[in-house]
Each structure stands twice: as C-alpha cells, then as structure tokens.
Amino acid sequence: PVEYMYVFIFALFLRPAASAQVANLRSYMRDVLVAAVITAIVSAVFVACYKFINNFGDLLLANEIARDMNAANVMADNAQFLIVIGFYVMLMFIVDRIKDRPVQFGLCVFLLLFFANNQLFDPTRHSRMYAERSFFGLTTVALFQAGDDYVIRMIHGITTHGQQSQNPEKKLHPTAYYAPLKLFIKSIDRSVSHSPYAVMGLGAGTLACVGHKSQHVDFFEIDPVVIHMAENTKYFTYLKDCPTKSTVILGDGRLKIAEAKDHKYSFIVMDAFTSDAIPTHLITREALATYRQKITKNGFIAFNISNRHIDLRYVLAKLARNAGMNAILLHDDGTSDPLYFSSTWVVLTHDDHFYTKLSKYVTDSMYIKDLNELNTSSTSLWSDNFTNILETLKVLRNFREN
C-alpha cells in the first residue's frame, strides 16, 4: 500500500494538463520552495499541538484527574482529532488554491496522506512504549486497558500479535486469540500430550504458556524485530517465565519446520496470518504434506484464521479433504473474559474422534462446526503452483451465498 501512495504522488508531479504552468526550472524550484515552506510551517504547528495534547494526557494520568487510563486517552484522542481535522481543512484550502501547480500540489497531498496514515489510523499513539520497523513492516509495543486489567500488546500494522496482562495473577494466562487452544490440547491423546509442539509466528510468545512443564516448544519467526520484542522482559515475560522450555528459530516457518524430525510434534499452531497479508505458501497442498510429516499420528494442526477480510474455511476444508484429514472449525466470540478476543480457528487432524472430544469442552461463548460438511466443489485446491486469494474475500463469499 505504501508503494501505491508513492506512485500516486509521483503521478501528481507529472500531470500533463498542468505542465504549462511550470515551463522552466525556476518555476519548479519556486514551487518546491513554496511547498517546503508550507510543509515546514504546518508540520511545526502540528507537532507542537501534538506534543501539547500528549503532555496533557500524561498530566491527567499523573495527577489522577482521570483515574481511568482510557478516559484520559479518549480526551486526548478527541482533542488531537480536532487538531488534525483543523489542519486538514487548512491543507485542503491550500491544495485547492494550488491545484494547477503540480509540485506544490503533489507535496501538499503527500503531507496530507502522511498525517492521515500516521495520526488518524495509529491506535497506539498515546500508549506506545516502543516501535521498530523491519522489512516486514512496523511493529509496536503499547499499553492498553482491558476491563479492570492493563495489558501490553504487540501490534503489527493494525493486527495484535499477542498481549500480556500486567496483573500478576494473570500474567502467564494465554489471552487474546488463544483461548480455544486450551480446548484443542485437552482433546489430544494423552500418549502424545507431553511431546514437543511447534508454533509458526512468535508474536509476544504467549503460546509458551499452553504447554506442560515437561514439554518443549519450537517457535518459528521470520521477523527479527518480533523476536527482539518478545525476548525483551521489559515488555513480555512469556518466554522467560512460562514453564514450557522454548526455542526461537529465525527464518521462514515452512522451510525451517521441514528440517525437523518426522513426527516430532504433538501439534503445530499456524499463527502467521494477519489482516494485511496472507502468506499463502503456508497453506498449500505441499505445505500441508510437510506439516503432516512432522506431527504424531493423532496430533493436530491448528490454523488461526481470524481475519476481517479473508475467509480461509473453504480453502482449509478442501486441503483437508484432499489429504484425508478431518477439518473442524471453532469460533470464540471472546465475551467470556475481557482479556480474550473474538477468534476463529480451524483444526486439521487424522483423529476421527477429535470432534467428539472437543465438543465436550465447548463453552457458551463458542461455536463448533465440522467443516467436512462444507461444499468445496467450487473452491480451488491451493498448491505451490496456484492460489486464488480472490475466492477467500469475505465480501465476495457473502455476495455469492446471498
């Protein structure tokens, strides 16, 4: 998306219809200077107001005028929102006045988009504790309030990749999307329940706490920034304090897990998906064949498919049917605890009794479905040679079903 924005702005600089307005280098340089001055003035005033609002929010918290952290943040949010909108109105006025000057117009539109991207759509701007960018995008650590508890969350883009309660009694509880995993583990055969397990996608390291003391977990993580944050005990202590021993392996999860011994893991958790990007190479026929080789006879592979825009149920059901496996969906609406999120999981297993065993543990906030009943005749069988992300879009799926 960032690249598209740059192309759009570049196109604004080169509008043929307005080329007559900038006939020589002096005109271009004058336009650049004017746009630079506008940018400098607006940025300086904006940053000053931004810092004032942030300091005002901190002052509210420090003096306990607003004891609820969210209340202080909402007040700061509202004030900052008005400031941002005010600047947008001013910028739109400027843009309208210079719409026939490509350089001025392009630079001012860039400023507008920059503020929109970094201020209006940044949910962590008041509570951010740390942020770092890598090849895979911006990852942020921020403090939030969840019910009566405070939590530290790891956020990549707009997707939460784990959180940890600051309540000592709940500090090692698997929260966020991971409540259903406890039920999956209860449903596994006791004979393999103490075998090692694997997780693709480290996040905050939450899943180190779903195993037993005698177990070992291998985390596969492709982003070194995520590893750095998860191992920093200033923010998250799962890897340090959870009873399960853990190893973090840097690299592409599919390639790295292929190096493990066959039938090593009692289960594999696929938690590498976000709303912004779906690593389709992790959910192909060939990838599933690799995972099947690495789990025990009646182990399982759990896919976290929680997503605003993408529905992977049919793709996974098709893959399971092709591999002779059972596919089970479990949705948790997240209402049983303020620390839980709404989440959707699909489990693939060779255990024909897994659905029956899992059904015994399903709570009122959960919904379970046997995906073997889905009609997947119109769904593509994803492979390393072919995937079709369009068929997974929820808006298209809902349109076809209605």
Predicted features along the sequence, with ranges:
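Alpha-helical transmembrane segments of multi-pass membrane proteins
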Residues: 1-365, 377, 384-402
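Extracellular/surface-exposed low-complexity segments
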Residues: 370-371, 375
